[in-house]
UniProtKB/Swiss-Prot annotation:
Alphabetized GO MF terms: glutamate-1-semialdehyde 2,1-aminomutase activity; pyridoxal phosphate binding; transaminase activity
UniProt KW Cytoplasm keyword: yes
Organism for this UniProt entry: Exiguobacterium sibiricum (strain DSM 17290 / CCUG 55495 / CIP 109462 / JCM 13490 / 255-15)
Keyword Magnesium: no
Predominant cellular place of this UniProt entry's protein: cytoplasm
Gene: hemL2
Cysteines engaged in disulfide bonds, as pairs: none
Protein's recorded name: Glutamate-1-semialdehyde 2,1-aminomutase 2
Length: 436
């Protein structure tokens, strides 16, 4: 099958970019190394569709890696950005729209009584760890294998996302002294968590976790896992931090914590809350958040934090989301899962799917995937071929086995059926290619 972008404007654009930026990109997964392709260079996007610079049209399940929950170029969000831009886009002094945005976040996220806006998910998680250490007086952080919390030094230990995509165990440049303050255990493994607390419980400031992991593929929590984390952290005076940068307002109307019924002490947000603009946030209990400067002694600041354009886009996004959207997400994700599994059974393709809300994951393995080691058992050669064939058929997927798919409010039933038709043809070819 011809991959049209391999001898195209995208190829020329990538060759131009290669000497200008590390690997030709500004974020590693965009290099498409793990799928053996030249990157698809976008020209524009509208609704559920993305168009490359050759004019090829794709059904988009990347959605800018999650933020575009209303689809691309939503007219209400577009109008909000344009209206704000006519009045300026950065002032260096407070604006009323920051309070309006904070009110919506606080009303929707069960754990958040006070919120601080920042510029990215990485900033949010870095600030949350500093806050946990400052509040508790403890130093160690417990995280989970395959969970990605941004590129802060102390969180690049056995991380997922692009780190897993490129096959990197950790990152050079992280001092051993910093790495030693991060404890790592398998996701969904409460026995391992208990052992870590038996050894280090008096010194663990925070447990940071994706309440549904989206950076080792999509892996939801097993029954009792989040509840177990809540219980053990309360027993030890440790703060529970939910990294909802990806799951926030995607897994549920009240985020993953509302969907699963477990309330952390601190929540990190990003992606959807900016409507596609650079943004992050962290919030939590009032007594914890009051420790942040200028109210308290724990310092964190940002020139562009609470940027009016980002606040306008985020507010216009969140106010359009309704509980019934999540019922539709569940229905469409269920149809995708059924269709994928039916095609896999028909053509003897090893496949497991996971889903929750507007997130969906596919693994080329017969075994259930509940942690990072199981995710890594997926057949990467098969994924690479699947990715290339689906792209050629006009379906834009995350170019990594270790990333999940995203749905938007504007993905139609016809989009889903077109996608499953492409899956059917692709799996038929995979059966022949891999002698299934």
């Amino acid at each position: 099958m011809s991959l049209t972008n391999q001898n195209s404007k995208s190829k020329a654009a990538f060759e131009r970019a290669l000497p200008l930026m590390p690997g030709g990109v500004n974020s590693p997964v965009r290099a498409y190394k793990s799928v053996g392709m030249t990157p698809i260079f976008a020209e524009r996007a509208q609704g559920s569709r993305l168009y490359d610079i050759d004019g090829k049209e794709y059904i988009d399940y990347v959605l800018s890696w999650g933020p575009m929950i209303l689809g691309h170029a939503d007219p209400i969000v577009t109008a909000a950005i344009q209206e704000q831009a006519t009045r300026g886009w950065s002032y260096g002094t407070p604006t009323e729209i920051e309070s309006a945005m904070a009110e919506v976040v606080i009303s929707r996220v069960p754990s958040v009584e006070v919120v601080r806006m920042v510029n990215s998910g990485t900033e949010a998680t870095m600030a949350a760890l500093r806050l946990a250490r400052g509040y508790t007086g403890k130093t160690k952080i417990l995280k989970f294998e395959g969970c990605y919390h941004g590129h802060g030094d102390s969180l690049l230990i056995k991380a997922g996302s692009g780190v897993a995509t490129l096959g990197l165990p950790d990152s050079p440049g992280v001092p051993a002294q910093i790495a030693s303050m991060t404890l790592t255990v398998p996701y969904n493994d409460m026995d391992a968590v208990r052992i870590a607390f038996e050894k280090h419980g008096d010194d663990i400031a925070g447990v940071i976790v994706e309440p549904a992991a989206g950076n080792m593929g999509f892996v939801p929590p097993q029954p009792g896992f989040l509840e177990g984390l809540r219980e053990i952290t309360e027993q030890h005076g440790t703060l529970l931090i939910f990294d909802e940068v990806m799951t926030g307002f995607r897994v549920g109307f009240n985020c993953a914590q509302g969907h699963f019924g477990v309330t952390p002490d601190i929540t990190c947000l990003g992606k959807v809350i900016g409507g596609g603009m650079p943004v992050g946030a962290y919030g939590g209990r009032r007594d914890i958040m009051e420790q942040i400067a200028p109210q308290g002694p724990i310092y964190q600041a940002g020139t562009l934090s609470g940027n009016p354009l980002a606040m306008a886009a985020g507010l216009a996004t969140l106010t359009q989301l309704k509980p019934e959207h999540y019922e539709e997400f569940d229905r469409k994700a269920n149809r995708l899962s059924e269709g994928y599994l039916a095609a896999a059974a028909k053509y003897n393709i090893p496949l497991t799917t996971n889903r929750a809300g507007a997130m969906f994951g596919v693994f080329f393995t017969d075994q259930p995937v509940t942690n990072f080691e199981q995710a890594k058992s997926s057949n990467l050669d098969m994924f690479r071929s699947y990715y290339q064939k689906m792209a050629a058929r006009g379906v834009f997927l995350p170019p990594s086995q270790f990333e999940g798919l995203f749905l938007s409010t504007v993905h139609t039933d016809d989009d889903i059926e077109q996608t499953l038709a492409a899956v059917e043809l692709t799996f038929k070819e995979l059966q022949l290619e891999f002698n299934r």
